[in-house]
Structures are given as structure tokens and as C-alpha cells.
């Protein structure tokens, strides 16, 4: 009986690691989706639901968490040495903070959403960018301004021109978004073909 339990535990660990590990090549959207085909289905579903392009979803996740499902902001340090508290409650693929994640769950009815799930994370990004378009009149195809709103929040968006750091980050997201867009145009036909998947 103990051997059976151990075997089940090993299988469970393998399944979890297979689902949660960072894709091997996060710079290539085709490679990401070939390795994690269900991610493609989830991203396409979010795109259809909210109108947020798949390539923008990926670019935001790459910048925010590098596709690490357990990503958190690094701890601040006291006297540059002693580990201290984290600067925010950002967590998971989307790096959503607790308050905004709570708002997302309440507004969408997705009560069981988890920041560690890719499916929920891309849906969150779709929801957020859609609200950005409504509140700030920023197109969901404008990766630069969408990321600024994502990073700074809707209230602080108007002050971004004085923030060189966030401007540089947004430029990187815009560049990565364009790269992902080009890559997806080359593999979308093969990705759209039904596949049998394990993970």
C-alpha cells in the first residue's frame, strides 16, 4: 500500500512539474505554444472574449513574470543586506496584485481564479486591457500604452511621461509584442490544428 501511495505521489509531482515549469524558449511564441498547447487554447479564448491579441498577452507575461507561475517581486533589503518585505503583493504569471485580482474575480464571476494558473492569468490580462481601453481610450493593439496602464494602474497612467523607467519597460513590451506577432503569423495554421495533449 505504501509503495502504491509513493507511486501516486511521484506521478503527481511529474504532472505538476510538467504543467508549471517555465517553457524552454520564452522568446519564441511558436515554441511556447508547441510545448504548452493548452496555453494557446486559453490565450485564444481570452482573445475572443476580450479582444486582447495573443501576442500582447504573452508580451505582458514575459515582462511581468518571465512565465514563472510562482513569480514574486524580490524582497527589499534593509541596509542593502537584510532581507525585508516585498514592495507589492504581485504574484503569478500576470503579477496581479491582490486588490486588482479581487476586483477581477468579482466583476467576472470567476471566483475560483488563481494567479498561478495560466488560464486565469490570460483572462485577467484580457479583462484588464479591456478596461484600459474603456477607461483610457487606449487600443488593445497599442502594446506600449497598454503596458504603461498595466504597470502603473489607470489612476497613474497620466503621469507616465515623467517616468523614464516605465517608458523603457513599455518599449520592451512593444518590441516583444511585435516579435511574438510575427512569429504567430508563421505558425498559427499549425497551432489551430487539433492536437492530442497530455499537459
Question: Which role does the model predict for each range below?
Answer:
Residues 3-12:
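Sec-dependent signal peptide recognition
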Residues 21-193, 198:
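Catalytic glycan-binding domains that act on GlcNAc-containing polysaccharides
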Amino acid at each position: 500500500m505504501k509503495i502504491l501511495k509513493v507511486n501516486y505521489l511521484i506521478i503527481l509531482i511529474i504532472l505538476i512539474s510538467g504543467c508549471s515549469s517555465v517553457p524552454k524558449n520564452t522568446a519564441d511564441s511558436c515554441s511556447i505554444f508547441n510545448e504548452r498547447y493548452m496555453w494557446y487554447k486559453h490565450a485564444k479564448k481570452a482573445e475572443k472574449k476580450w479582444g486582447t491579441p495573443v501576442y500582447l498577452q504573452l508580451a505582458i507575461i514575459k515582462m511581468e513574470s518571465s512565465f514563472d507561475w510562482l513569480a514574486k517581486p524580490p524582497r527589499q533589503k534593509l541596509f542593502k543586506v537584510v532581507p525585508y518585505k516585498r514592495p507589492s503583493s504581485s504574484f503569478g504569471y500576470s503579477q496581479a496584485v491582490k486588490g486588482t485580482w479581487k476586483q477581477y474575480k468579482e466583476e467576472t464571476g470567476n471566483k475560483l481564479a488563481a494567479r498561478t494558473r495560466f488560464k486565469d492569468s490570460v483572462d485577467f490580462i484580457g479583462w484588464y486591457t479591456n478596461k484600459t481601453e474603456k477607461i483610457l481610450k487606449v487600443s488593445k493593439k497599442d502594446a506600449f500604452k497598454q503596458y504603461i496602464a498595466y504597470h502603473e494602474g489607470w489612476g497613474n497612467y497620466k503621469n507616465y511621461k515623467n517616468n523614464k523607467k516605465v517608458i523603457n519597460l513599455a518599449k520592451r513590451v512593444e518590441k516583444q509584442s511585435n516579435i511574438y506577432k510575427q512569429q504567430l503569423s508563421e505558425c498559427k495554421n499549425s497551432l489551430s490544428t487539433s492536437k492530442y495533449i497530455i499537459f
